[in-house]
Regions:
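Enzymes that process phosphate groups on RNA ends and nucleotide/triphosphate substrates
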Residues: 181, 185
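Conserved hydrophobic/aromatic "anchor" residues
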Residues: 186-190
Length: 211
């Protein structure tokens, strides 16, 4: 299964991933504020992460959640720490915050968490923005990020050629993708297939080309 920290409207990238994963038959749920609570200041300490993670293989967060207010930012950090303790795998969707000025600040906070992240995914928009920020060529950006951070799977979707890419220590994989929802549909299917396809490079290749 899969859980994600999302806003109550379901308009963020992590919530979108959850609804796509559900439509693909993966048991998925969103962790958010309670009814009547203000999302930016909700009581995040009341979340029972242990219980939420009991059936989850993946815990999903999005980078822009850091700009949603103090409570979401603290829940963002807590969820990753609990995922490690509970034996879940952390997935980080790198998306672009609504205020482009804050991108270097939030990307810096993701970098501080790399040790806890198993799958890092860039939307095509953020791939362009962050490669520019880091002064890296977009062409080999994913493998450079993987070398720098040692995150096991660094993925991204590129709209220009409708391709999903996965950088792994043993290979750089390319898969044609419909590109629905900025590549999130590809990511949902990839995350659904990965636990079943085996951890070896062949399994990762098979999971990447699930479409």
């Amino acid at each position: 299964g899969m859980i994600a920290l999302g806003n109550p409207e379901g308009s963020d990238k992590a919530s979108q991933l959850i609804s796509i994963a559900s439509s693909l038959g993966l048991k998925s749920s969103i962790v958010t504020s309670g009814p009547g609570e203000n999302f930016e200041s909700f009581n995040h300490g009341a979340i029972d992460w242990k219980e939420k993670m009991a059936m989850a293989h993946w815990v999903v967060n999005s980078m822009s959640m850091l700009t949603a207010g103090p409570s979401p930012a603290m829940a963002w950090s807590a969820s990753m720490t609990f995922a490690e303790l509970e034996g879940c795998r952390n997935v980080m969707i790198v998306d672009t915050p609504s205020d482009p000025e804050s991108i270097s600040m939030v990307w810096g906070q993701v970098i501080e968490k790399v040790r806890q992240i198993h799958v890092l995914f860039f939307t095509s928009h953020s791939l362009h923005a962050i490669s520019e920020l880091e002064g890296l060529d977009a062409h080999d950006f994913l493998s450079r990020v993987r070398e720098k951070t040692l995150i096991p799977l660094v993925c991204g979707y590129s709209e220009s050629d409708s391709c999903a890419r996965v950088a792994h220590a043993l290979d750089n994989i390319q898969a044609q993708s419909s590109g629905e929802s900025e590549g999130l549909r590809w990511l949902a299917g990839f995350l659904k297939a990965l636990p079943l396809s085996g951890a070896g490079i062949e399994g990762i290749r098979a999971a990447a080309s699930w479409e």
